[in-house]
């Protein structure tokens, strides 16, 4: 399998000052505990928690879909930052569980939050999708195709997971996060991206629901299938390699990182990645125990939580890493711009002129 060091974007010059200036999140009200699975699966709270680190997760209602997760996350963003949607000219949604193959979930979200006319499209990279979408949004602003991007990571994984399969049912949850990506003052924002994929491992994690891929007369297979052992080995290796590559590209070392925000898939994967970095769990944001694996929404949910409780401070160095179906991986370094601390500043006057 190709190494992340050979991934796209590795040799790009320093990025212009573009970062996150607003954020919001949403998790459904329906809390599903490990004890709930004991009612219909051969499992227990102790068995699930010891192997995954998950205690509970949230499930969307029967009539709620991924666009609903995204819209509610955007509504939370607007509650926090009332003028955040002004001037948004592009909407990007990272999701592996879209409402439909088309129209895009991004288009549905845009229409429901009053952004009709904005460019809107989805990014499909499974659990790596949020990091991929950050790179896409950053590129839209840097290249002049947009001035302000609404980035959403949202999923309803409960609808594409077989709830009778112990190997996958216990892992996944639903939720969404929303962010504004735009120019920020010099010294803040995204510093590096490392993205990659290798379809040699595609059969280890997939949802095959496209009719023409099935043998004649075969039933549709709408549920996620996963080879947990293979995904675990891949994840531990690629998180370490892509994280180091992103830091190297930004001129950073592990000691420069204030917070690691990893994709929340399994506590054992996170612990193994931390060991490879030589990074303490105390410097790692983990909320897996309460939300499970929400795929492209895990990093937004974790980032917002750590920002809300005061762990993430203005100017701190963040490292975000994800892996997922493809098999894919993505890592980015980010100097955090605290939108509340800088509220009311003339951001446009402070930001450097964008040059690609």
Regions from the language model: what does each represent?
Residues 2-5, 67, 71-74, 97-98, ...:
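Claisen-condensing/thiolase-fold acyl-transfer catalytic domains that form or cleave C-C bonds
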Residues 2-62, 165-233, 237, 241, ...:
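Condensing-enzyme catalytic core mediating Claisen C-C bond formation in acyl metabolism
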Residues 21-24, 94, 124, 149-155, ...:
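Short beta-strand segments
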Residues 31-32, 102-104, 161-165, 329-333:
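Short acidic, glycine/serine/threonine-rich loops at helix termini
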Residues 41-50, 100-114, 151-157, 210-217, ...:
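Acidic-glycine-rich active-site phosphate/pyrophosphate-binding loop
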Residues 73-89, 241-258, 306-311:
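Phosphate/pyrophosphate-binding loops at sites that engage ATP/ADP/AMP, CoA/4′-phosphopantetheine
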Residues 80, 84-116:
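Anion-binding (especially nucleotide phosphate/pyrophosphate-binding) glycine-rich loop
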Residues 142-175:
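Flexible, glycine-rich active-site loops centered on histidine and acidic residues
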């Amino acid at each position: 399998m190709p190494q992340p060091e050979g991934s796209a974007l590795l040799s790009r010059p320093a990025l212009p000052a573009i970062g996150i200036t607003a954020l919001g999140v949403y998790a459904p009200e329906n809390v599903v505990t490990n004890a709930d699975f004991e009612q219909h699966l051969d499992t227990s709270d102790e068995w699930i928690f010891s192997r995954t680190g998950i205690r509970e997760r949230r499930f969307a209602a029967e009539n709620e879909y991924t666009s609903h997760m995204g819209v509610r996350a955007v509504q939370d963003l607007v509650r926090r930052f009332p003028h955040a949607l002004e001037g948004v000219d592009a909407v990007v949604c990272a999701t592996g569980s879209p409402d439909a193959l088309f129209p895009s979930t991004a288009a549905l979200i845009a229409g429901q939050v009053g952004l009709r006319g904005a460019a809107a499209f989805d990014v499909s990279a499974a659990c790596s999708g949020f990091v991929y979408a950050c790179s896409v949004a950053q590129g839209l602003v840097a290249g002049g195709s947009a001035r302000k991007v609404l980035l959403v990571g949202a999923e309803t994984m409960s609808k594409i997971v077989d709830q009778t399969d112990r190997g996958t049912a216990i892992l996944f949850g639903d939720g969404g996060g929303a962010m504004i990506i735009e120019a920020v003052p010099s010294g803040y924002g995204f510093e590096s991206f490392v993205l990659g994929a290798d379809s040699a491992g595609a059969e280890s994690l997939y949802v095959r629901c496209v009719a023409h891929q099935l043998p004649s007369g075969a039933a549709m297979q709408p549920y996620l299938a996963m080879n947990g052992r293979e995904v675990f080995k891949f994840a531990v290796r690629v998180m370490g390699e892509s994280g180091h590559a992103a830091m190297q590209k930004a001129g950073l070392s592990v000691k420069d990182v204030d917070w690691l925000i990893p994709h929340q898939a399994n506590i054992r994967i996170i612990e193994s990645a931390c060991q490879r970095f030589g990074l303490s769990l105390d410097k790692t944001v983990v909320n897996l125990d309460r939300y499970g694996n929400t795929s492209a929404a895990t990093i937004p949910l974790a980032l917002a939580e750590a920002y809300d409780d005061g762990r993430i401070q203005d100017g701190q160095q963040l490292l975000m890493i994800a892996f997922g179906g493809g098999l894919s991986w993505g890592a980015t370094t980010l100097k955090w711009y605290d939108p509340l601390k800088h509220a009311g500043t003339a951001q446009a006057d402070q930001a450097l002129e964008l040059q690609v």
